[in-house]
Regions:
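Structured alpha-helical segments in the cores of large, soluble enzyme domains
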Residues: 19-24, 101, 108-110, 142-145, ...
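Mobile, glycine- and charge-enriched loop segments
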Residues: 1-10, 155, 159, 212-234
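Enzymes and membrane/adaptor proteins characterized by extended Gly/Ser/Thr/Asp/Glu-rich
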Residues: 22-137, 156, 161-169, 191-204, ...
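Short, well-ordered coil/turn segments that N-cap beta-strands
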Residues: 3-5, 29-30, 54-59, 109-111, ...
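Preference for extracellular/luminal or secreted protein segments
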Residues: 1-28, 217, 236-316
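Phosphate/pyrophosphate-binding betaalpha-module
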Residues: 137-156, 164, 168-187
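Oxyanion-binding "anion nests"
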Residues: 180-198, 223
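Surface-exposed amphipathic alpha-helices with a cationic face
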Residues: 46-54, 106, 138-147, 207-220
Length: 316
């Protein structure tokens, strides 16, 4: 068993050390979250990491809220989520956005798109403020991602717009998209915010009440939960927080500031006899995700994928 496999370090192009990334790949991390790459640099990085990894195949994540341009700087622009509802056929546009996002992502080596955001609101990256509209558009986006060959991640649970609401109020609003999409979600990502009416002491991503009590038990979600990217999470003690998340049934730790420190902390916990079953389960899901990607469509050449996206939305 390799606890490192549940950790996905961040790699910031132009800032992060490629040698350090290679060391982490050799340690057996499950993949990487990419930030600020061009298509060519992303392709080169993906190949280099898979060449040195003991597993050969890794999961590479696009940590986005709206469009692939957030992490692949030369990717074509696609319609913002908040404007999709203005189109004549919004569900078709949402599907095409998901499909083209996946085709472009796979072309550069990214196989896990950490989207969509299903928070309710008026501004991007929200699809809208009406629960059923968000459910429909996000569901079509996910269908497009899946048919395009990429994994998805629905976020940010339990819904940022419900931060001051009661559970009863959230039941008919923020929870609606989640309940409709659980079967299609490859993963759920909890928020980094505190929801005082659920757990006044912990951020959602660190909350046993939010993840185990609400998501897993009350809403009966059976799938994978991934962490909010740790470097964004305002965590005082990152490694200890990562261990706490794993005890809350989070399976994968994304983009820590100190990946080696997190891996060491998890390994110490395993040496004490804790988290063994949880990590075995997480690694099993990881293998399932790799198989799902392998069974999907072959990646297009980058130029072809980008041209497809540019052509598709010129008239939309």
């Amino acid at each position: 068993m390799k606890p490192a496999r549940i950790v996905f370090p961040g790699f910031w192009f132009g800032k992060s050390s490629i040698k350090k990334a290679e060391e982490l790949a050799r340690l057996g991390v499950g993949g990487f979250c990419l930030y600020g790459a061009t298509a060519k640099k992303a392709q080169d990085f993906v190949k280099r990491m898979q060449d040195v990894s003991p597993y050969g195949q890794l999961l590479f994540c696009a940590d986005i809220t709206d469009t692939l341009q957030e992490v692949i700087t030369d990717a074509p622009a696609l319609p913002a989520n908040g404007k999709i509802g203005q189109h004549d056929f919004p569900q078709d546009v949402a599907y095409r956005k998901g499909y083209l996002t996946a085709r472009m992502a796979l072309a550069v080596g990214i196989n896990w798109v950490l989207a969509p955001v299903v928070d309710l609101g008026y501004n991007t990256p929200a699809f809208g403020d009406v629960p059923l509209q968000v459910t429909q558009l996000a569901g079509d986006f996910i269908a497009g991602l899946s048919n395009g060959g990429a994994l998805n991640c629905v976020k940010y649970f339990p819904g940022v717009s419900g931060v001051l609401k009661t559970l009863a109020q959230m039941e008919d609003a923020e929870f609606v998209p989640y309940k409709h999409m659980f079967r299609r979600a490859d993963a759920i990502m909890p928020s980094d915010m505190i929801f005082p009416n659920i757990d006044n002491d912990n951020q959602a991503m660190l909350s046993d009440k939010v993840i185990k009590g609400l998501l897993k038990k009350r809403l009966n979600y059976k799938g994978c939960v991934v962490s909010f990217p740790l470097f964004k999470g305002h965590l005082k003690y990152e490694a200890a927080s990562a261990v706490k998340m794993l005890h809350c049934n989070v399976e994968n730790i994304l983009a820590p500031r100190d990946a080696e420190g997190v891996i060491d902390a998890v390994e110490r916990e395993v040496d004490k006899g804790f988290l063994v079953d949880e990590i075995i389960h997480a690694v099993s899901n990881h293998e399932m995700f790799l198989s799902k990607v392998a069974a999907g469509p072959e990646p297009l050449p980058v130029k072809e994928a980008f041209a497809l996206a540019e052509k598709d939305f010129k008239k939309k």
